[in-house]
Amino acid sequence: MASLLTLENIHKTFEAGTVNENHVLKGLDLEVEEGDFIYVIGGNGAGKSTLMNILAGNLSVDEGDLLLAGKSIKNLSVRKRAKDIARVFQYPKMGIASRLTIEENMAIALRRGQKRGLGWGVKEKDRIQFQEALKELNIGLENRLKVDTQYLSGGQRQALTLVMAALVKPKLLLLDEHTAALDPKTSQMVMDLTQKIVEHHQWTTLMITHDMNHAIEYGNRLIMLYQGKIVVDVKGEEKKHLTVEDLMHLFQKNSGQSLVSDELVLG
């Protein structure tokens, strides 16, 4: 299968030339195939958030290139990338305007990447599309389009942002620890919805998580970052049978360092 996303020799340094210089990504290479659902794990400072911000366009690269569907995107702004790359953030209130209704938020998401102007209101054909998309969640939001999102629970907001992110059928979906701020029961609910929706639509997805059990249970591929490089990359049948112990062994074998599971949970 052809690569949808290619990262070539990505370097990123913060505060270069100072005593606080931090070389976060060190020649990172990654090939992502269309339809991959990749979990990205690693301890604090491994480069996970930096990688997400580079993909979304919030950070530029110092060296290297990013190719999406064969075209370089490294010089594109966040707005220009937004049509092809959608992102769901860690905190339920991010990515949603809490004083706007569900349908108003979805209308904004539907026009992501477009210039603001006339025709940004909610149309009847939009409502039909929104209801169809929300039905997939099976949590009743399709009947609450005119409810302000400030009255939704954290889990409902994250489920909504997941649907909003995918309204324009992005080439790439970025999930930035989108269950981390939820209680365990709600986190599991959102994860189950995520797996169901991503698999149904075959969206190419990268998700950051600190939960090794989620990383092992969900998705078709798992990569682990350490000191700015990918040290573990597991997919296919190997991923299906992977255990936490296997993962820790692979990390030690490839990095030369020992790892305890708490380092990822706390990282």
PLM feature segments, named:
Residues 2-4, 13-27, 77:
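A short, flexible loop at the N-terminus of ABC-type nucleotide-binding domains that lies
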